Amino acid sequence: MVKNFSISVISKKENKENRGSIEFQILNFTKKIRRLTSHLKLHKKDFLSQKGLRKILGKRHRLLAYLSKKLKICYKDLIEKLEIRDTKTH
């Protein structure tokens, strides 16, 4: 629950006007991923949700790769704020 609270604070504070930015999209994907993982802990055989989770993970991965190539400083800050692992493929 603490992670969800910190994400909501970040989204309200920084991205109120700029909803199309890469950071805001990654933030929304992270919210969806955390919500789906908690759902899948209860419903292990929900294969459609698993497929949706994999799609969202792929989209977030591509956006993070783009952000790491274009804006390395913003990428590092976002990784720290959202507490996401830094992948080595970027």
Swiss-Prot record:
One record GO biological process: translation
Protein name as it appears in the record: Small ribosomal subunit protein uS15c
Record's keyword terms, sorted: Plastid, Ribonucleoprotein, Ribosomal protein
Subcellular locations according to the entry: Plastid
Lineage per the UniProt record: Eukaryota, Viridiplantae, Streptophyta, Embryophyta, Tracheophyta
GO molecular function: structural constituent of ribosome
Main location: plastid
Family matches, as InterPro entries: Ribosomal_uS15 (IPR000589), Ribosomal_uS15_bac-type (IPR005290), uS15_NS1_RNA-bd_sf (IPR009068)
Quaternary organization: Part of the 30S ribosomal subunit.
GO cellular component terms given for this protein: plastid; ribonucleoprotein complex; ribosome
PANTHER family: RIBOSOMAL PROTEIN S15, BACTERIAL AND ORGANELLAR, SMALL RIBOSOMAL SUBUNIT PROTEIN US15M
Similarity comment: Belongs to the universal ribosomal protein uS15 family.
